[in-house]
A protein has these predicted regions:
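Alpha-helical transmembrane segments and their membrane-interface boundaries
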Residues: 1-66, 109-118, 128-141
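Hydrophobic transmembrane alpha-helices of secondary-active transporters
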Residues: 18-23, 75-83, 105
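Short, amphipathic, aromatic/basic-enriched membrane-interface segments that mark the entry/exit
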Residues: 32-37, 60, 82-93
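Small-residue-rich segments of transmembrane alpha-helices in multi-pass membrane proteins
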Residues: 41-51, 72-76, 96-109
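Alpha-helical transmembrane-segment detector that highlights a single hydrophobic TM helix
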Residues: 59-87
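Interhelical loops and loop-helix junctions of multi-pass membrane transporters/channels
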Residues: 63-67, 92-93, 97-99
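Alpha-helical transmembrane segments and their membrane-interface exit regions
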Residues: 73-78, 123-132
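Membrane-helix boundary connector in multi-pass membrane proteins
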Residues: 86-88, 102-116
């Protein structure tokens, strides 16, 4: 039988997967460079790193280093998504999303569920209407 701690870890990973899936689905539907699986993996990975960092005990342990390393790693991942085509830069929004999803995952991992859910909601409120507004602006040009 699973302990309370193990159940909490599974719940955190499941919450991270759902939040990552919600944001990733929007990218997937618009055929963007990083789809739903990538978004879920980033969110779950960040959550797991947060869980591990909060579980480490000791006087010489600086758990904030793990969170900063996650941000650094996501920066490299995001850099691989951004590219220039003619006079346009592509993948910038997707890279920014992955960066925010890592923060959402870290929030879930340390138990800041409200913050993670609120941030996911705000991200979706920016992405969905934002795409519609962008199309309208481009039509007027």
């Amino acid at each position: 039988m699973l302990s309370i701690v193990e159940i909490e870890i599974i719940a955190k990973l499941a919450i991270a997967a759902i939040l990552g899936m919600l944001v990733g689905l929007e990218r997937e539907l618009h055929h963007k460079p990083a789809g739903m699986r990538t978004h879920v993996l980033v969110c779950i990975g960040a959550t797991l790193f947060a869980i591990i960092s909060t579980s480490i005990k000791g006087d010489l342990v600086d758990t904030s280093r793990i969170a900063s390393s996650v941000v650094l790693g996501i920066g490299f991942l995001g850099a691989g998504i951004i590219f220039k085509e003619a006079d346009r830069v592509k993948g910038l929004t997707t890279a920014a999303e992955l960066w925010v999803l890592a923060a959402i995952g870290l929030a879930v991992g340390i138990g800041f569920y409200f913050t993670a859910i609120a941030t996911t909601t705000i991200v979706l409120l920016i992405l969905v209407p934002g795409k519609i507004m962008e199309k309208n602006i481009k039509k007027r040009r």
